[in-house]
């Protein structure tokens, strides 16, 4: 409500400021009602937003199971710290085990000019303005032009080039004796190379020969597999093995095993159940009716939200199409409208028939023909999408509509601010005019009294 300064009636003796304030309170009643509506609508929008957050969480959890790759999860274990074993996060994983020893680790080719040296790194090591690196395996030649033929200049030029495939180091053989060493960027036998164009240091020799990593697989009828790096892929479908240390002669063979990641998959199911329960609880709290002294929720009796809750429950009770009840995979509804998850029952079903168990959640069929597959996670994704999708989702539209109503009410409140300010100014002028008129009458009365007294 607009307020303003005024002086109480000096002639009338009235508390005109209080009178005007009382009148303005009456005048502002429609604006006060609008402000109450804004407050109520803000609470409604906030409730929709809270439910939307819960439904978005359900959507995220359901998508984690709606993705077929989520069901291909596997866990790899190694009997030795000398080997790191991992499984694919996107493709399929073969379960089973493999036993082997690490015969050798991969190494990069390294060559050094050990027979010659210079007294300082600023001394020249070649009369050529060009050097070459030749890959022994492929025969590919890479050339590099030199502008500085000193040891330091050559090292800097090589290390400043991105396509030579080698790195250079100035090595101190002894005090006052410096030479050049080159090392391949990659490991493996194919990293072997030769150097051309360095004529001031004598011949180069292999400090380390490029070699592949080798695994000796099996314990009796063994065979070997090699890799240019210490990482091996394809020994089992989805398995990646990284060798970190060579096996000693007396070391026992290393066994790597791959098992279905039942705990990880069960955790995703539990997360979806928890998210569904969170959404159901939020909707129930927001839509509950008043009971005795207990107030109702902000959205008490809201049919749209009650329908959303019913849809979640129907998705559970509807099962997984022709496969049957979700109870078979450990999911049930309680009498108070919550979901429960029996991990033991789920894991048992998953181990017994992985493909069938997956189809309860991520199905290939669409019995209803509504574009949403029969799987529980499939249906949850479809339902949650319809509720939360930007612009078109049920909740998104309710939030947008609510915010539009708040804006309209706020604009009307602003109009009332102008109207009430004008009304208060009018009242102040009217009361001021009344005081002026009363003052004039008082003066006339005093004059008449004086005239009568003089008679």
Identify the function of each model-found stretch.
Residues 1-39, 52, 56, 60-283, ...:
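Bacterial flagellar/type III secretion structural subunits and associated motility module proteins
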Residues 290-292:
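Aromatic-rich transmembrane-lumenal/periplasmic boundary elements in polytopic membrane proteins
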